[in-house]
């Protein structure tokens, strides 16, 4: 689940399936046009990004080592250990080398997640094939919200420039290949 404040995404699924548009209005300015979420898109070039969402109280857990490179079932063990302890993963990044995996989780779950992962991979850690997991806290997860962003060059660049210009360091990055 997500902690985004605008709309709870699982409530959209039945509407998307039945092709029913959803209109989001500003309660402080109800006469404003608002935003329409639908299966059809009609966008001007400067309307690609519709907003920015965020989730506060985020920690990242980083797990790395050569012992995970090319090992079938590694990710399955990793995520099953978290899932069996009801730890929700907000974001996932993995290096293309398969040398590391990083997840964003609610900070309230951070210490439990570290214990669970270090216990699950206790043997690999003891053999120095994988390092103990590391936690970094006091973070937030931000996302730009829009449609047809993958066909518009420079969207990510503008986001990263804005963050850098405001002295905000990016700790992990994930971008889906789909438009949803």
Task: Please report, for each region that a protein language model flagged, where it lies by residue.
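C-terminal catalytic "cap/lid" subdomain
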Residues: 2-180
